[in-house]
């Protein structure tokens, strides 16, 4: 599935899944403008994406804190001006904090919801405003999580923020498709990322060991989490393509059967 001529904004492209998607979109021929607050990581992703052999697209990095609505508005204006338009938003940026549910404080909630939910709202609004004003039947791809469906040990705030993203996306999928034929979907990835490694390092050791021992039962395919480039990027390319124009309001679980088993 090729994306020649597509103009795509990606959030969180300084590392992990989003960086992999930036590279994948560029390989597929898209023009990509992406953001992060990690400038070192963002510039590295830009260099890596543009250095890929036979890649016909281009990636450009800008700094943007998606918790700041004004910053998001300014970022979208720059990105759209640079690319000459917008067809797809892949909103992938995300954060988490892990501790027993009874120990969470306001700062934890503000931090996690600020990126995961508020950032989703601000970026989605800017994309839709452009699509509606210009008659573009665009696509919005939000990142949620299986934890929004199943819960997560020591991750109550993270799981709650992702449940909020799922509810938001299903609602705008109804409203914005009816108004402007804009399609909105969620992806729930069970993919090895820096965030996953962080969870392994910071969660209760007993919980981590129990989780590792259960991987083979949790993931029917491979008995483990998937890889960004081989397992996730092809799904993201498809959802950004015209071939996915009739897919709307869906939660695509790229997880080797994890939720099915649970």
Language-model region placement:
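Short C-terminal tail/terminal secondary-structure segment
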Residues: 2, 150, 237, 248-262
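Canonical Rossmann dinucleotide-binding motif of NAD(H)/NADP(H)-dependent dehydrogenases/reductases
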Residues: 3-33
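Substrate-binding pocket helix/loop in short-chain dehydrogenase/reductase
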Residues: 100-101, 105-113, 204, 215
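Active-site helix of classical SDR
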Residues: 124, 161, 169
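Residue(s) in the substrate-gating loop at a strand-loop-helix junction
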Residues: 145
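Short, small/polar-rich loop/turn modules that mediate ligand/substrate recognition or access, typified
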Residues: 177-183, 247-249
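C-terminal helical subdomain
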Residues: 186, 207-247, 254-256
């Amino acid at each position: 599935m090729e994306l020649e001529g597509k103009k795509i904004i990606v959030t969180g492209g300084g590392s992990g899944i989003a960086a992999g998607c930036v590279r994948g979109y560029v390989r597929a021929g898209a023009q990509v403008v992406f953001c992060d607050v990690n400038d070192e990581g963002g510039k590295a992703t830009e260099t890596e994406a543009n250095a890929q052999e036979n890649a016909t697209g281009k990636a450009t990095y800008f700094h943007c804190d998606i918790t700041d609505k004004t910053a998001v508005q300014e970022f979208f204006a720059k990105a759209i001006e640079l690319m000459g338009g917008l067809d797809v938003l892949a909103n992938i940026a995300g954060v988490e904090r892990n501790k027993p549910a009874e120990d969470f404080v306001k700062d934890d909630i503000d931090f996690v919801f600020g990126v995961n939910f508020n950032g989703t709202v601000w970026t989605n609004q800017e994309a839709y405003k452009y699509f509606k004003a210009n008659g573009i039947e665009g696509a919005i791809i939000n990142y949620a999580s299986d934890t929004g469906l199943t819960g997560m040990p020591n991750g109550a705030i993270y799981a709650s923020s992702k449940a909020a993203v799922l509810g938001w996306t299903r609602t705008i999928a109804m409203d914005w498709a009816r108004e402007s034929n804009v399609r909105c979907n969620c992806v729930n990835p069970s993919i090895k990322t820096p965030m996953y490694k962080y969870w392994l390092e910071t969660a209760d050791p007993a919980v981590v060991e129990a989780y590792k021992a259960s991987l083979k039962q949790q993931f029917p395919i491979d008995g483990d989490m998937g890889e960004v480039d081989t397992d996730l990027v092809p799904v993201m390319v498809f959802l950004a393509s015209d071939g996915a124009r009739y897919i709307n309001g869906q939660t695509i679980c790229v997880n080797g059967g994890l939720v099915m088993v649970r």
